[in-house]
Each structure stands twice: as structure tokens, then as C-alpha cells.
Curated annotation (Swiss-Prot):
It comes from the Eukaryota. It comes from Arabidopsis thaliana. Unspecific reductase providing both diastereomeric alcohols from the prochiral ketones. Active on cyclic monoterpenes and small flexible lipophilic carbonyls. No activity with tropinone, nitrogen-containing tropinone analogs, tropine or pseudotropine as substrate. Pfam families: adh_short_C2 (PF13561). InterPro entries: NAD(P)-bd_dom_sf, Sc_DH/Rdtase_CS, SDR_fam, TR. This is Senescence-associated protein 13.
Length: 269
């Protein structure tokens, strides 16, 4: 029988009574995830580097009646990650149901042009932060009796996408981390899954990708369009629900079919 963590059969499609930490929640996919979890009843804490943006989002969330708290944190910093988890532990009395490792960045260069500093920065922001925050969250997730970790990875961790080899390497490693933690922490009733978006319209993608890149992304996507942040967040929320209690160690793409698209003829012969 599936463990419900004391939530009861009638709460299979609710996050009421649960607590969550979402990194990078002030914009893009992170913002959409915060709202999705809060709409389902979770108490959510989120962090970002920009305090002004955080306060703007917080006012919006409070106006909607969401139970959200915020703090400033640069998750590429080990000391700040430790402080963040101390804050979360204090807020939620040493228990946490949901951890969404969402923060990510990239530097787009040919592989031969990357510096040691480039490598360290992308690795620390994407992979090291997800690994360390999962470590720090483990006792809180275990104490909750029903824990779920979701790593926001990328289609670039599943197939080649020319957005930087370091970025792709970090995302591939995150997918494997999800598999490892799923097996290692299953006995603690902690599930871990990886969500891999393709081209999603966010402030980050708008900053990095020009219209030509977007056209190419659309051309290679069977659904013929790019995605939106609120098309990723429902999957993240589902993986945290009691109804997903037997799903762990999975890598799931949200990509309009892009990662399964081989070579598609415009017209059949």
C-alpha cells in the first residue's frame, strides 16, 4: 500500500499541510512552480538573488492569498545555502515535504573557449547547489515522513542542444543524481525526480536566445511552438502530490516532442 504521509486518501490531489522550498522563485519556471504549489495548498518558501524582484512577487502572492515566504540567497554560495536551509528548518519546525532545485544558469561559448572560472561558476550554480541543498534538506525531508525532491534539469541533459557543453554536462549529471537519490533515499520515504524542459519562454531564455534560435527551436519541435513556464509547473506539482507516491527516479521531458523527434519530412513521399 502506498504511504500517504498521514495526509489521508481524500488528499491525494492536494498539497494542503505540506511545506516546500523552491529555489529561484522570483521569475520564470521557478515563479510558476511557487504559484502551482501554493494553489494546491502548500506553504512555500522561495529564494532569489534580487530582493526587489522577490518583494514584488511576494506582494502579488499575498494578494492571491498564497502562503509564501521569501529570503535573499545566491545558491552558488555554499555558506548561503547553509543559511537558507537553516531558515527553512526554523520556519517549518525541522520538517520539509518538497524541495524544488530550480536555479540554473549557462555561459554560451565553444568548448575550447571556456575558462576555469566559467566551469566553476556553472557547475556551482547548477549541479553543486542541487547536490548540496538535497544533502542539507535530507533530515528535514525524512522528518516529514513524505518527501519529494524535483530537480529542474533540461532537455540539454538528455540530448545534444548547442547551448554550451558545461550546461549540458550539469543537466545530465542532475538527471543521474535524481536516479541515485531515488534509490538511496527510498527507505526514508523520499522520492526524487528530474524534469527536463525544452525551450520555455522565460526571462532567461529571452536574454540568451535570439529570434533565429527560437525559429530553429520551433522548427524542430513536433508541436510547432515553444513552451510556457505554466506548462512545466503542473508536472512539478504532480510529482510532489500524494497521488504520485510510486513515481521516483524518473527523468521526464516537457518539450513538445522535441527530444523524441528524429528526422521529420515535411511531406510523406
Amino acid at each position: 500500500m502506498a504511504k500517504e504521509g498521514g495526509l489521508g486518501e481524500n488528499s491525494r490531489w492536494s498539497l494542503g499541510g505540506m511545506t516546500a522550498l523552491v529555489t529561484g522563485g522570483s521569475k520564470g519556471i521557478g515563479e510558476a512552480v511557487v504559484e502551482e504549489l501554493a494553489m494546491l495548498g502548500a506553504k512555500v518558501h522561495t529564494c532569489a538573488r534580487d530582493e526587489t524582484q522577490l518583494q514584488e512577487r511576494l506582494r502579488e502572492w499575498q494578494a492571491k492569498g498564497f502562503q509564501v515566504t521569501t529570503s535573499v540567497c545566491d545558491v552558488s554560495s555554499r555558506d548561503q545555502r547553509v543559511k537558507l536551509m537553516e531558515t527553512v528548518s526554523s520556519l517549518y519546525q525541522g520538517k520539509l515535504n518538497i524541495l524544488v532545485n530550480n536555479v540554473g544558469t549557462s555561459i554560451f561559448k565553444p568548448t575550447t573557449e571556456y575558462t576555469a572560472e566559467d566551469f566553476s561558476f556553472v557547475m556551482a550554480t547548477n549541479l553543486e547547489s542541487a547536490f548540496h541543498l538535497s544533502q542539507l534538506a535530507h533530515p528535514l525531508l525524512k522528518a516529514s515522513g513524505s518527501g519529494s525532491i524535483v530537480l529542474i534539469s533540461s532537455a540539454a541533459g538528455v540530448v545534444h542542444v548547442n547551448v554550451g557543453s558545461i550546461y549540458g554536462a550539469t543537466k545530465g549529471a542532475m538527471n543521474q543524481l535524481a536516479r541515485n537519490l531515488a534509490c538511496e533515499w527510498a527507505s526514508d520515504n523520499i522520492r526524487t525526480n528530474s524534469v527536463c524542459p525544452w525551450y520555455i519562454t522565460t526571462p532567461l531564455s529571452n536574454d540568451f536566445f535570439d529570434e533565429e534560435f527560437k525559429k530553429e527551436a520551433v522548427r524542430t519541435t513536433p508541436m510547432g511552438r515553444v513552451g510556457e513556464a505554466n506548462e512545466v509547473s503542473p508536472l512539478v506539482a504532480f510529482l510532489c502530490l500524494p497521488s504520485a507516491s510510486y513515481i521516483t527516479g524518473q527523468t521526464i521531458c516537457v518539450d513538445g516532442g522535441a527530444t523524441v523527434n528524429g528526422f521529420s519530412f515535411k511531406t510523406m513521399p
